[in-house]
Amino acid sequence: MKQPGQQTVNKGETYQIEITDMTHDGEGVGRVDDFAVFVPEALPGDVVLARVISVKKTYARALIEKILTKSNQRITPVCQKAEWCGGCQLAHMDYKHQLAWKQRYVEEALNRLGKIETKVLPIIGMENPEGYRNKSQFPVGFADSKLVMGFFQKRSHQIVDTDHCRIQHPLINKAFQSVKQVLRDLRVEPYNEINHSGVIRHVVIRVSFCNHALMIVFVTRTDDFPHRDELITCLTKELPEPASVYQNINSKV
């Protein structure tokens, strides 16, 4: 006879799971015969058919095959790439419930984990929960015979090539588009994770809410950066906002 919390699922098999909670990083939590199963993109109130992809001693992870009953927290993401892109974890959850989840997460971190008995005041939400992210990091790669730049696909290192992100500050979107086009025009070679060739690993862009100044950081494999001066000159012309440009060397293989 299985004891509560003992393994009752098998890798590769599909189970009907009612989602009752969420982890700190936004994965749904359900149980199969009292054995915890974490399900990415699932929300409390969902009932899903999910295929188990890994089994540990005290929990398993599964991916949604089909949503049988939709949670009242679930919405259709506005972004058409949300299904694949790893840039947003809760694009499928309505904003009111996002705030409630974050509120509870802070309360649990302080009261249950930190043993600090204190009252957490309600989170002050935004009137429009878009355009607020003032720092983004974009991996750079090569696909379909061209340089690509965007966000890693969920659970992979495949890059979702994009030109716009709704939650980023508009100036980051503008700078992002300019940087990608200039890198393509100058034929700067992206870093290749397989053979460790190429130069550009990531581009980090940050904007100040105070004066709208931009900071652009090129994370490179080596100090040698072909077309570096040309790149800076082109960006200076493309971006009228005050901008600073840095190079961060990461030679780690």
Model-derived segments and their meaning:
Residues K2-V253:
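Accessory RNA-recognition modules of RNA-modification enzymes
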